[in-house]
Amino acid sequence: MSGPWALHAIFRVPPFGAAKIRAVKKERKHYHLDWTLVPENGPRFENLVACHLAKWVEFEQDVKGRDVELRYFRDVDGREVDFVVCERAQPKLLVECKWGDDGIVRGLSYLKERFAAADAWQISATGKKDYVTPEGIRVAPALTLLRTLV
């Protein structure tokens, strides 16, 4: 192992792929452990959420012995979800990050439809709306989700 991830400057998130979806299975996303290094607001916010989710996943693995992992979703049709937390290879938490109060991302709707038991969130950095869609997707400020994590 070499490069910035060997120095613990960045970490990688692998893609989530399941038999019933046409997911991209090779590309990994990279995030800075120091999310303040990211210059643009939207990507910096996504990086901040990645750090919080990665910390929570590691806590659940190390302290509680859970078989959980942090992934993301992107398919060949261009649908994407920023984060998919899986337990025993099954999605348990879907998280999409937005800077403001945007409409529901189609990738999130797509995954929620296929994995109805998973909790689905679209969180925003600056948005104020807090509601649940008819599909069962929670739209809320980021703090609402992040404060539930360790």
Go through each PLM region and give its residues.
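Short, hydrophobic beta-strand segments that form beta-sheet elements in well-ordered domains
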Residues: V95-C97, A118-S124
